[in-house]
Amino acid sequence: MTIRGLQQKVAAALNKVEALVQHGCKVFAEDMLTVQDALNSAVATAGKIAVVVVTPRFERDASGCTDGFPSGCELRVACIEAPAQRSKRNGFTALDAAETVAHALDSDSIEWRSIDQTADERRGVVTATAEFGLTIILTNPTERN
């Protein structure tokens, strides 16, 4: 699997999670939308939460095999909350979205590790990021089967 393929697969799976859909969250693979574009999209849709799947680190686990390299991977899912969402009473927050993502993805093959939350007070934006670990066979994106 390629890095892009992993991001797209995770984004597609999360876009089917009922709780995220119900609360108007839209999940994007990092290669499809920058974080700033995701935030702009969230703000434009009357205070929704944008969710961006990123893969900041891959580390080779073993020597190559015929299909690629066994690789340990960090997978992060950033849930970006627009200021309008924060002001809604009993609204679904970035932290709620990150917890939902943690429960949706945690499995035998994807290990949930942590949730971190940060706030940009100047812009009023809150980001909660769920981090996971997994191992995949990293394939060459220029070689299509």
Regions found by a protein language model. Name each.
Residues 20-22, 47-49, 91-145:
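Acidic-leaning, charged glycine-interspersed low-complexity segments
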Residues 1-65:
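Small/polar-rich, solvent-exposed N-terminal microdomains that initiate assembly or binding
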Residues 56-72, 142-145:
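Hydrophobic transmembrane alpha-helix bundles
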Residues 67-85, 126-140:
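Oligomerization/assembly interface segments of phage tail-like spikes and tubes
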Residues 61-63, 85-89:
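Short, solvent-exposed secondary-structure capping/transition elements
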